[in-house]
From Swiss-Prot:
Alphabetical list of Gene3D superfamilies matching this protein: 3.30.190.20, 3.40.50.790
SUPFAM superfamilies reported in the protein's UniProt record: Ribosomal protein L1
GO molecular function, one term: rRNA binding
GO process annotations (BP): regulation of translation; translation
Alphabetized UniProt keyword annotations: Repressor, Ribonucleoprotein, Ribosomal protein, RNA-binding, rRNA-binding, Translation regulation, tRNA-binding
Annotated protein name in UniProt: Large ribosomal subunit protein uL1
Record function comment: Binds directly to 23S rRNA. The L1 stalk is quite mobile in the ribosome, and is involved in E site tRNA release.
Assembly mode: Part of the 50S ribosomal subunit.
HAMAP family: Ribosomal_uL1_B
Entry keyword annotation includes tRNA-binding: yes
GO cellular component: cytosolic large ribosomal subunit
Keyword Nucleotidyltransferase set for record: no
Matching CDD domains: Ribosomal_L1
Length: 233
């Protein structure tokens, strides 16, 4: 049996895994349990009332978190001409066409988000085997294939996060860092939940947002009371 460290034991003693905590209490508790020697990510897991095996119930989208993510995001853009200049002006670190495609094929991927103008998808489409497994393939459903590349770059820089339900019907996302104030984490979480509600598939029946839990990178999961979420919305 693996021996638990004092830090892990201390965390486990603070969190009642059978309890549903009011939203503010849950966020404060997660911050309190984030005791690692780095600025831990604060994450959320949302169990949705869908059948993830059915194609008409796949939940996917993107949302700009009002308080940002606390991360510096490097953005690459496939664009040419005026759109390339607009992307650069908006803050994109990398802008290109064929040369950028060759770099990606060669394994040089020094960006976090890839955006593409629709007229470049003939080139981008050849990169699916490289970008797909890394979750970097541009997609119009999350706003990364768009004629308005400048706005897409600004959104990425402002703290946009992409979400997609996994095979278990759960959406995982980061809503900030331990250094964030509880109010900032709260506003980010509520923005994410609002986006999830807007992305609800028509085929979904019954309770849609079934369970919500927050955690830090090295901390325990804290379940959130649904009534407190509805009151805060």
């Amino acid at each position: 049996m693996t021996k638990l460290s004092k830090r892990v034991k201390a965390i486990q003693s603070k969190v009642d895994r059978n309890k549903f905590y009011p939203l503010e209490d849950a966020l404060n508790l997660v911050k309190e349990c984030a005791t690692a020697k780095f600025d831990e990510s604060i994450d959320v897991a949302v169990q949705l009332g869908i059948d993830a095996k059915k194609s008409d119930q796949v939940v996917r989208g993107a949302v700009v978190l009002p308080a940002g993510t606390g991360k510096h995001v490097r953005v690459a853009v496939f664009a040419q001409g005026e759109k390339a200049e607009q992307a650069k002006a908006a803050g994109a670190e990398i802008v290109g066409m064929e040369e950028l495609a060759e770099q990606i094929k060669g394994g040089k991927i020094d960006f976090d988000i890839l955006i593409a103008s629709p007229d470049t998808m003939k080139i981008v489409g050849t990169l699916g085997q490289v970008l797909g497994p890394r979750g970097l393939m541009p997609n119009p459903k999350v706003g990364t294939v768009t004629p308005d590349v400048a706005t897409a770059v600004k959104n990425a820089k402002a703290g946009q996060v992409q979400f997609r339900v996994d095979k278990a019907g759960i959406v995982h996302a980061s809503i900030g860092r331990r250094s964030f104030e509880p109010a900032a984490l709260k506003s980010n979480l509520l923005a994410l939940l609002e986006a999830l509600n807007k992305a609800k598939p028509p085929a979904s029946k019954g309770i849609y947002l079934k369970k919500v839990a927050v955690s830090s990178t090295m901390g325990a999961g804290v379940r959130v009371d649904q009534a407190s979420l509805q009151a805060a919305a």
